[in-house]
Amino acid sequence: MAKRNPSIDTKNLTAVQLMELDACVRCGECVKWCPTYAASGEKPGLAPRDKILRWRQYMNKSYGLKARLFGPQEIPISELEEFKDDVHGCTTCGICSTVCEAGINTVELWESMRANLVKKGIGPYGKQNMFPKLIGQYRNPYMKDQKDRLAWVPPDVKIEDKADIVYFTGCTAGYNQLALAFATSRVLNKLGIKFAMLGEDEWCCGSALIRTGQAHINNVPYELAKHNVEAIQKKGAKKVLFACAGCFRAAKVDWPRLLGKELPFEVVHVSEFLAGLIKEGKIKWEKSINKTVTYHDPCHLGRHVGVFDAPRYVLSHIPGVKFVEMDRIKEFQRCCGAGGGVKAGLPDLAMAVAESRVKDALDTKADILSSCCPFCKRNLMDGRDSLKVDLVVEDVIELVAEALNLETK
């Protein structure tokens, strides 16, 4: 009788991750904090602990002592398909890793599980499977023409051909959420900051592919990172500014990992850059906002990279802003619901998480819910509209632009 092959393999799982599967002590702390588990009505399969225990069970069935003695046990494809749905029902926000008593790096574990299944033809989820083809062909996920990368730039914005600073716009801000690009570019001009942009040479950062377990398909993320780094170098940049938290995380964490070396320039989020200018007394405000503002930490900016204080510092120094905090902030913040491909693959789940976060903001009595991420802004606006409540959702850079008496349209 032919020996059965294991239903799963160890591809994409490092030795550390294999040990992490055994490190879970089933305490359930992650279950209490998981935003998608809560928003789903506590569907058991979405709990972080459940995903680890199930994958550990799969590994034992495939490679444990009994498997070595008597051959691997078959795992029905229907069961793996169900697991695929659950592992993709995660925004990769990282709160489970933050509260994990065993210190398991769950974000990278989920991404490895996703990649493992995708390589076996199981997953990704829904529209997520279009990402490699779209981004590989169009260099952006929206099927937009690369020639239109700078179509949004208004006549009043001055861009240098080469400069020490490059503003990396990002696909979402450059094609869909133009207010973010308008605000960032005009603020930089107003402050006398000379900057260049990549234009047609700006390609997608690759974040969506990596988060959904598709980094290996045609090696697209590597090609994106390599091209963007070379394009930035050609501009003579020493510093690259990002207003998109997802792009920032990709450049800060993923690009060096993909390329196997440190980047030849500094990667800075615009909130960090502005906080530095405020401390140096280089921003002269022209208008008072006179609103109560709260702040939502984007997962990619906060938990993933550790930028928590800069956006708060900026907001607290805008004239007329009364800054208030929500109940869950910084390392323990509640995700907006858009990350990890959930907005594209499971929009109803993304909406449910967003509604929970909007309710957090409403509890503060704030007039404005701010963030530093176009995906957070979009999903929080959707959550607000679903709840039919009166709450302005704006990016921090938009509030800065307003206080400098600049247009964001």
UniProtKB/Swiss-Prot annotation:
Leading EC class: oxidoreductase
Q: How is the cofactor bound?
A: Binds 2 [4Fe-4S] cluster.
- Residues forming coiled coils: none
* Co-factor requirement: [4Fe-4S] cluster
Question: EC number(s) for this protein?
Answer: 1.8.98.1
Q: In which pathway does it act?
A: Cofactor metabolism; coenzyme M-coenzyme B heterodisulfide reduction; coenzyme B and coenzyme M from coenzyme M-coenzyme B heterodisulfide: step 1/1
The residues the record assigns to binding [4Fe-4S] cluster 2 are C34, C90, C93, C96
Which of this chain's residues are annotated to bind [4Fe-4S] cluster 1?
Answer: C24, C27, C30, C100
Q: Which InterPro entries match?
A: 4Fe4S_Fe-S-bd (IPR017896), 4Fe4S_Fe_S_CS (IPR017900), Cys_rich_dom (IPR004017), HdrB/HdrD_reductase (IPR051278), Helical_ferredxn (IPR009051)
Enumerate the spans annotated as 4Fe-4S ferredoxin-type domain: 14-44, 81-110
The record, for Gene3D superfamilies, names: Alpha-helical ferredoxin
Q: Give GO MF terms, alphabetically.
A: 4 iron, 4 sulfur cluster binding; CoB--CoM heterodisulfide reductase activity; metal ion binding
**According to its UniProt record, which protein family does this protein belong to?**
Belongs to the HdrD family.
As for what it does, the entry says:
Part of a complex that catalyzes the reversible reduction of CoM-S-S-CoB to the thiol-coenzymes H-S-CoM (coenzyme M) and H-S-CoB (coenzyme B). Electrons probably transfer from phenazine to the high potential 4Fe cluster in HdrD subunit, then to the low potential heme in HdrE subunit and finally to CoM-S-S-CoB.
The entry's other comment says: Methanophenazine seems to mediate electron transfer from F(420)H(2) dehydrogenase to the dihydromethanophenazine:CoB--CoM heterodisulfide reductase.
Q: What is this protein called?
A: Dihydromethanophenazine:CoB--CoM heterodisulfide reductase subunit D
The organism named in the record is Methanosarcina thermophila (strain ATCC 43570 / DSM 1825 / OCM 12 / VKM B-1830 / TM-1)
